[in-house]
Amino acid sequence: MIAYFKSLPDGYFPVDGCVLLVREAWQRFLHLENLPKHMDQFVTPDYAHELIDGYQGQLIEPIQKPEHLCMVAASGKGKWHCGVFSAEQMPGYVIHTLGCTVKIEPLNQFRRRFDTVEFYRHATHCRVSTSDTKG
């Protein structure tokens, strides 16, 4: 996943196209179809939280810790931003947009710029665990 997003040219996503990046990651790597398409630029934290609240239980569900391919939503200082989490490499990276450029940075570095960071997975996407299955 990291290699795919690194290969994209500058301008692939529009300015403030972070939600489109998450949408593309979920379509490409979780094979999801019919995801909503949002391109609102300069989304306020309040408006973003309204959208997230409206999608909870149907499209997304909050999780306490980041999982591979979860959406990372962050807000602070009147800004809202999002990206997708990759656990392909340690310590775990957030893939997001900065202007029209794809940016990949460690989660801890991403967190420092925001007051609140939350994690959401696709509501029908659950981690597969074989440790507690009985054959």
Predicted features, each with a name:
Residues 65-66, 90:
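Residue-level preference for short coil/turn positions at secondary-structure junctions
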